[in-house]
Amino acid sequence: MIVRSLLLAGSLLLASVVPAAHAKSDGPEIKVKEFDKVPTNPYYFEDTDTVMLSGHMAELFISTDAASTWEPLKDKDGLLFPNRYHSQSAVIYGPNRKHWATFDAAKTWREFEVPEKLIFSNEGPRPFTFHGKDPNKVIINAEECLISLCRRVTYYTTDGFKTIKKLLKNDMGCYWAVGTPVFAEGQKDLPEKLDDRIFCIWAHITPFDRTRRLIYSDTYFSDDKFRAVEIGGREIKGVNNIALIKKYLVLAASSEGTSEAAIYVSKDAVNWGRAEFYGGPKIRGGSFTVLESTNYSIQVNAASRRSRRPIGSLFTSDSAGTSFTMNVDGVNEDEKMYTDFEQVSGIQGIFLINLVDNAADVKSGQSSEKKIVSRISFDDGRTFKPLKCGDKDLHLHSITRPSNMGRIFSSPAPGLIMGVGNTGDKLKEYENGNLYVSNDAGVTWRKALDKSHKYEFGDQGSLLVAIADDGKDELLTDEISYSLNHGKDWKKAKLPHKAAAIWLTTTPDSTSLQFLLIAQGKGKSYAMSIDFSNVHERKCEEKDFERWPARLDEKGEPDCLMGHKQFYRRRKADADCFVKEKFKEPVPETEACKCTKEDFECSAGFRRNKDYDCEPDGKLKPADGKCKNPDDKFMGPSGYRMIPGDDCIKKGGVDLEKEVERPCKDVTKAPASGQIAVEKTTFETKNLNYRYLERSDTSSGDDETVILRTDDGNLFVTRDHGKTWQRGKFQEPILQYIPHKYDHDVVYLLTQGKKAYWSIDRAHSFHSFEGKLPVTRTKGTLPLFFHPDHPDWLIWIGGENCNGQKCTDLAYYSKNRGDEWDLLLRGVGKCMFAGKKDELTADDLIFCSQHEHEDPRKNLRLVSSVDQFAKTTSIHFDGKPIVGYAKMSEFIVAATKNGTELQSFTSVDGKTFAHAAFPPNYHVGAEYAYTVLDSSTHSIFLHVTDHSAQNNEFGSILKSNSNGTSYVMSLRDANRNKADYVDFEKIQVVEGVAMANIVANADEVRHKGQDKKFRSMISHNDASEWALMPPPKKDVEGHSFDCKVKDKGTEECALHIHGYTERRDSRDSMSSGSAVGLIIGVGNVGPYLTTRAESDTFMSRDAGITWHQVRKGRYQWEFGDQGSIVVIVAEEKPTKVLSYSLDEGETWTDFEFTDKEVKVEDISTVPSDTSRNFLLWARGGSPGELIAYNVDFTGLKEREKQCVLKKESPEADDYYLWSPKHPQQKSNCLFGHVSVYHRKRPEAKCYNGPKLDRLSSEKKNCECTRQDYECDYNYERQSDGSCALVKGLQPADPMKICKDDPEAVEYFEPTGYRKLPVSTCEGGHQLDHIVARPCPNKKKEFEKKHPGIGGFGIFLAIFFPVTAATAIGYWAFSKWDGKFGRIRLGESQPESLFAGNSPLITIPVAIVAGTVAVITALPLLFSSLWRSFKGYTRLSNPWGQRQRPYASRDAFAARRGEYVGVVDDEDELLGAEEFEGDDDEEV
């Protein structure tokens, strides 16, 4: 979203003063200042003669006599930021964190400082955000940086910078709720502290985090408590931007899976509503502009996102700002999204706009040149008319082609409009235009001057000034033109120097007779004051004024808008006088009108149709007791309400607010019937090939769209989940459909040839395009690839010289959805976009696997480029052959062959690939294969096939560290099939739970060729530990199983579930992304997994901790309404019955969906599992017959009302809080926290509705333990869990932070450990920051941060503890298990007095390997104890994470008295790492 303002900056240097030029008595008086550099950014303090200019090297200049004389602003260099809501206020952004503010139009300045550097960019955030009413309240936007990484820090002042306080960290922008002077005017029941309310966009993890929320506080976040903006009890997430438009707060949000943006609007900073857009394209993120708006509506231009020549659609909202109707399509805009739209200043309802007359051709690519025409509206955008100069159409240059500062066409001068353009059928280039003027607000126009000019208005419009301009600021001239009669006649005045005009400006209210011209001559620049005060001696009298009507109707009579006519007192055009009412802006007078239809807008639940009438937006709801019969009628809402602020007279006028009689056929559907509804559709096709177009959080509408391709190439589409279907009309058979990977609204259809189709509106309409070559026929090669952040960017793989399923493949790319193509590479295997904005990769990064010498018979190599291979190509691995590569989350993984070994490499930035270190003694042969399984928790799960005999494939699952460079063994002998699919599945939503099937007789399979026998395993701590699954105690009939166990599975008795390798549809899963904790699978109880035919159906409600049998035999399943409905149907056998459960599988009900038995091939619903509709895909009696049954559960009485979830009391109504268990750990902490989820109570008779934010804000962070750390760079995990330096490598340079960040005070010595990126743990064991050292030349700052202790303190610290320490050390050494000197990751210790987390071990008191270690550890002990006593328990690093200062024994010896202590750390930190001569390199 973009709110445009023209703020221009530059530089100048004052050189000398030129004497004033004495003009003739009938011309203006001109005074000149000379400059070496062009003066820029002139700013007038409103209602004063004070003007400021920005200068060279940020020097500022000031004039207090309307630009006649200038002086440097002493000792206050910087950039000027005016407060546009308080005309006397401005702030100077100065260097070196020193700034100045004025509140009296630069008469006095107040100096202030901010600890961090302020944020500033021309297109991005500004350093200061001003309050709409109180000039003393300012938000200050800063950032703190560590090396090249920066984060936002926001400050605020409420007393005009006398005091400055910190507001928030990690925000993405903060804004006052009262951000404009008129916000909340006339509103009732406003918050008590609305003037103090601040909204902030807050990202918990990264600036690109899709969970960005809009939070707010009325106490400046002083109590660390804040609330997030909600609608219907659900937080708005994915917030991108917020804008303050007159009386409106406008919020834009986005979500994964769609480019559609959601717009939310509030008029009171309390209640928010989602804006709906009718009659035009959907609003897409980054492609709409909020335009200049009114106090009673918002104007938005929504751009077409595909074309390099963008074109928009203009929408206008109702007074609530939530219902938008398209005014006109084809609005001209440029690539920066500036839009040719401007309202006429001071007059309601009139605006000028430029349209693209050939918009359809430009959008389709048939025309590369826009034909731009100008239009004007006199009725708030309801109708548009051409601008007329005589009988010719006039076209004017607008916002996309500015030539001066400020407004383009108009000023506060009533009714006077000027512009540069031409007559004819389209707008020509600026330099070919003339100057035109209108004195009746655009009704009629006349040519004022030949050629293009810059222009300005003065003395309330009685004076017009212009200077020749070529649009390039290069045309030298020594004269100006001026008119004293509204542009009818023009005179010229000589300038003292020949120069090119840069800016021509005057006071903001256009009441002055003095103008400022900034111009550039040959070698010199000028600031010229042009004063017309003496041109007319007479001041206008009352006879010289007219009562001018601001708007005229088609009959030339004064027109009404917002219930009144508008008039101005204006000087007559031919009066020979000046108004001379400086700083007195013209004020309109109004005359009330009788109410007409135009004074009403649509009320809630209604929208405008093409005839501008209000019609129901959906079904109406009658009063209780009405509409018992369909033929009845009832009195219902008219659909209209008077526009708030409209002051028309109702008496004698139209009143559309009265209720009207409506037919009952227009009402909402009847109450729930209690029945399940079924709709049947038959197709002719042997293959089942369907796809859902999923909805995202910000998707508008409520369709549930499915596309189906039949064997003959026909495409069928349903938008109501299979109740009704439409057949697509295409000229060629559809070969395949490809949904957009990152935008669920988009789908591509491919044919046998070059021709293809796309739809961006969920298959409502399709448009054709052509690739450069027919799509590839090479087996296994995908023909289309998409960019994750740019929905219109494509890579097309086309084939030439095809021989069967083998082609020479060429890759092409397009940035406009196939309108234009450019060649990437020849002889490719595959190409993909690898850049993503929330990762370290470049936006334009493309990876390709390319055959050597472009010959498909030769090996593939990996290449990449950031300029589409135009100039630069990076060849990775020195051109060695690669087996393949893949992109998983933030990782790019590649496999290469090195002799007899298969090697894996990983990159997170697309530039540098690091060799992945596999576990010791784990050799990966060249004949092995990789399968990348998952990387959702900042770790790569990799399956390495180490046994590849036909139909007996299996291997090992390895888990990487957070940068993919070091792997540990997760699970051996994991099953795989010949298609490279692996029996491994992460349970959705619930963190850390995964299931896998292993080959239990791996040795027999390897050495004796036996068939595989399987067992199922489950992990509850992200695949660090695995266990067999416990079987249910009883079967569904209440009988015991043949084997029994107590609490957990054994090799003789466990539950086993058929896995991923046996599924017919890879989209099926055992769990759901919205049904928290529910798992369903088909399997058996026993020592091994039996055949699928012998299996039964089992279900878990607690993420796999316990299971129960659902049905005897094997069933297919699907979750609906986020798990509140579970449907199962028999697999591979004829049936006419399905079963469903409304209580998470506790009880089941049978339902007969057909009267004849069919064999159900699949059961499906929307991928998010949020619908109450299902599709059963079945086979009937005749060959090739496919039957689709829509089964609709919305009529059930048990699902009639929507469930209630209140964030402030989440367990008060239909939900409860649930935390998953982690039985392989002593606590339920995983990744540093205990997760808490919202779950619907099984007994609650309601439906969930839209997807819930399942993860509760009640999440509890845990103290850090060893499980929250991994091995650091160049360290690798040992067999005992410790991290040791890789032989031959050195730790990363810890002093790099000092070199990269000049303000860094200290660095930490490497420990071998670093915190897991996903861990949110706090406190506890800080293993990554132990030994602190001062940066070079920062010794004093370091000592100030870590003060030492005196001699007496040392004596006390040594004398009293030494005896106890020695005794405890000896006792521990003799009694403990001897595991000194290591930190073990993922290792469980028995709970004992000396377990790793025992308090006696936590306090570092001489738990060491012998007497020498005890003695050398004493200084560390004493320092720790002393600092504990003094309270130095924690120091905060620049990134807000809790870190622990620490000193090694070496540091103590080298720097007596400058101890850096550690509190509550583990005994295992005290090892032998500092004895360099020792063989033991353990940490």
UniProtKB/Swiss-Prot annotation:
Superkingdom of source: Eukaryota
Transmembrane segments: 1348-1368, 1400-1420
BNR repeats: 376-385, 436-446, 482-492, 716-726, 1098-1108, 1140-1149
GO annotation terms (biological process): Golgi to endosome transport; Golgi to vacuole transport; protein targeting to vacuole
Cellular component aspect of the GO annotation: cytosol; Golgi apparatus; membrane
Residues in the signal sequence: 1-23
Subcellular compartments: Golgi apparatus, trans-Golgi network membrane; Prevacuolar compartment membrane
Listed SMART domains: VPS10 (SM00602)
Cytoplasmic topological domain: 1369-1399
Membrane topology term: Multi-pass membrane protein
Glycosylation sites: N295, N898, N963
Record's keyword terms, sorted: Glycoprotein, Golgi apparatus, Membrane, Protein transport, Receptor, Repeat, Signal, Transmembrane, Transmembrane helix, Transport
Lumenal side: 24-1347, 1421-1483
Record's keyword annotation contains Secreted: no
Stated family: Belongs to the VPS10-related sortilin family.
Functional description taken from the UniProt entry: Functions as a sorting receptor in the Golgi compartment required for the intracellular sorting and delivery of soluble vacuolar proteins, like carboxypeptidase Y (CPY) and proteinase A. Executes multiple rounds of sorting by cycling between the late Golgi and a prevacuolar endosome-like compartment.
Protein's recorded name: Vacuolar protein sorting/targeting protein 10
Name of the gene encoding the protein in the UniProt record: VPS10
